[in-house]
Swiss-Prot record:
CC annotations in GO: CCR4-NOT complex; cytoplasm; nucleus
One BP annotation, GO: regulatory ncRNA-mediated gene silencing
Protein location: Cytoplasm; Nucleus
The protein's role, per its UniProt record: Component of the CCR4-NOT complex which is one of the major cellular mRNA deadenylases and is linked to various cellular processes including bulk mRNA degradation, miRNA-mediated repression, translational repression during translational initiation and general transcription regulation. Additional complex functions may be a consequence of its influence on mRNA expression. Is required for the association of cnot10 with the CCR4-NOT complex. Seems not to be required for complex deadenylase function.
Name of protein: CCR4-NOT transcription complex subunit 11
Key words, A-Z: Cytoplasm, Nucleus, RNA-mediated gene silencing, Transcription, Transcription regulation, Translation regulation
Coiled-coil segments on the chain, per record: none
Subunit structure: Component of the CCR4-NOT complex. cnot10 and cnot11 form a subcomplex docked to the cnot1 scaffold.
Organism name: Danio rerio (Zebrafish)
Record Pfam families: CNOT11 (PF10155)
Length: 445
């Protein structure tokens, strides 16, 4: 944050009383001519320090110049991304008299005048170009009593609070080492700019300038004593160690059952299992409830298991209900290609456990979308019949609230009304919409 003496001289020249007769556009051109983007943060830190010290920056036009430059350096970025946005929030946020007294003793920003507040609020909104054609001296003399300007900075304050919450606790408890004099000189000797510039140079230049120092809690731990203390804890080292190897008798013992189950499971992902293999696999899963986590089933392999062995997939999903990955398994299941086996798995799961409604709704939407997009008429008719039977089962068993999908399902039935099952589903929807109870087990004709 340190500045070279030449850079500080250029900055103080832009901030001088004489420069306050130049327009804001001219001040901006002079500033960007002297300082590059890499120097903006260091220059901004010096400007904030000057704003905190009324005896170094006493006049309103100079403060207006400082506020304008803090905004101008980061005007192309969002306001919350400006590292000095907290300065704007502090100056625009009104404080009580007691808080103002506390701030003057804590090195915070002193209050600003109404024209300064008006100018700052214009910067935070969409400032008109005519405003930058004025000079700081003209803005400081504006009469704004007839045009009060209030803006909502709650969004900015929230963003600043989130940024501050990420800081270390020690940093949040620190404050600058440069404090304003609470009892300024009352000799009325006037402001001497040369003296103020010398003081500013001593504060911000040099290898370790006071601007970079601050006060914060230091957690200093005492050095442990070199001599033995009374009642000191003694560390005992055995003088005659006796090491005995503790053998794990079960280690390296071949587990034939586990190997066989993994072999069957690997086959289940590729082809249907025989009845004997299914019985053996499900029997071992019943004996050891944790076996399901160690035989190779992952969310990515679930579609292969569903297509080749839907009954095994159902039993394994039921045993994985307490797993932290069950949401991933459900997501893969409802997004896989629609088929008779996937419908069978979803239907059995809905009757066995309470699936999240959003997963069921997503699966129904995917089924309807698949039926609408398929080109083969024979396959389309077959899938539509499957979907209609599946939906009737869900509705009659009261697993879904049909009102949540009424419009989508009704449009599906109308589109495929030529198919008998779709017409039956449509009549069931109308029956429910009229408040009637559908007859259990009634077959649509």
């Amino acid at each position: 944050m340190t500045l070279a003496p030449k850079d500080l001289s250029n900055l103080l020249g832009i901030m001088s009383e004489d420069a306050c007769s130049s327009s804001f556009e001219q001040l901006s051109s002079a500033f960007h001519h002297c300082f590059g983007k890499a120097e903006h943060f260091g220059v901004g830190s010096v400007l904030v320090m000057l704003l905190q010290q009324p005896d170094l920056l006493p006049s309103a036009p100079q403060r207006l110049t400082a506020l304008y430059l803090l905004w101008e350096m980061y005007r192309t970025e969002p306001l919350a991304a400006n590292p000095f946005a907290a300065v704007f929030a502090h100056l625009l946020n009104p404080s009580s008299a007691a808080e103002e007294q506390e701030k003057t003793l804590s090195g915070f920003l002193p209050p600003i005048t109404l024209p300064e507040k008006f100018f700052l609020s214009q910067l935070m909104l969409a400032p008109p170009r005519e405003l930058f054609k004025k000079t700081p001296r003209q803005v400081s003399c504006m009469d704004i009593t007839s045009t009060p300007q209030t803006i909502d900075i709650s969004g900015l304050q929230l963003a600043l609070a989130e940024r501050q919450s990420e800081l270390p606790t020690q940093s949040k408890a620190s404050f600058p080492s440069l404090l304003s004099d609470p009892d300024p000189d009352s000799s009325n000797s006037g402001f001497d700019s040369s003296v103020a510039n010398q003081i500013t140079e001593s504060l911000v230049t040099g290898p370790r300038p006071p601007l970079e120092s601050h006060f914060r809690p230091e957690f200093i731990r005492p050095t442990p004593p070199l001599l033995v203390c009374e009642d000191e804890l003694c560390w005992l080292n055995p003088c005659e160690p006796e090491h005995r190897v503790q053998w794990d008798r079960s280690m390296c013992v071949r587990n034939g059952t586990g190997v066989e189950i993994k072999r069957i499971m690997a086959k289940a992902f590729k082809s249907p299992l025989s009845a004997a293999q299914q019985t053996q696999l499900l029997g071992e899963l019943e004996k050891d409830l944790k076996l399901v986590y160690h035989i190779g089933l992952t969310p990515a392999k679930l579609p292969d298991l569903v297509e080749n062995n839907p009954l095994v997939a159902i039993e394994m999903l039921l045993k994985l209900m307490s797993s932290s990955q069950i949401t991933e398994y459900f997501s893969v299941l409802v997004n896989m290609d629609m088929s008779l086996h996937s419908m069978e798995v979803v239907n059995r799961l809905t009757t066995a456990v309470d699936l999240p409604p959003e997963f069921i709704h997503l699966y129904i939407s995917n089924c309807i979308s698949t039926c609408e997009q398929i080109k083969d008429k024979y396959m389309q008719n077959r899938l539509v019949r499957l979907v209609c039977v599946f939906l009737q089962s869900l509705i009659r068993n009261k697993i879904i609230n049909v009102q949540d999908l009424f419009i989508e399902v009704q449009a599906f039935c109308i589109e495929f009304s030529r198919i008998r099952e779709a017409a039956g589903l449509f009549r069931l929807l109308k029956t429910l919409d009229n408040g009637e109870t559908p007859a259990e087990g009634k077959t649509s004709k």
